[in-house]
Amino acid sequence: SKGLMRAHFSEVKKQKEKLKTIISAQTKNRHLGLIRIEFSRFAHRLMDWDNHCASFKHVGDSLKDCGVIIDDNPKIVTQFVPYQFQIKMAEQEYMIIKITDVE
């Protein structure tokens, strides 16, 4: 990944469209209130925590665009918990996003 600051707007658009396609295919859930998000990344190389958290930017925007969450701001996302796990094969990288409604 080229990172958030270095990505050309057309590349960002492609990344978000791909994420929205994946999200739309995997869930029809809607979270209409306060939420907790657990963001787990399984990758060959671990990131610094600031980069790992920043890598959620396009995911959060796509979740909002797909209507899964109403917003990705701190008034709605009351808890954001990042996890990362190192795996052996770069070809098998994936992420898991767990969204829990908060009362």
Whereabouts are the PLM-identified features?
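Catalytic phosphate/metal-binding cores of nucleic-acid and nucleotide-processing enzymes, i.e., regions
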Residues: 1-103
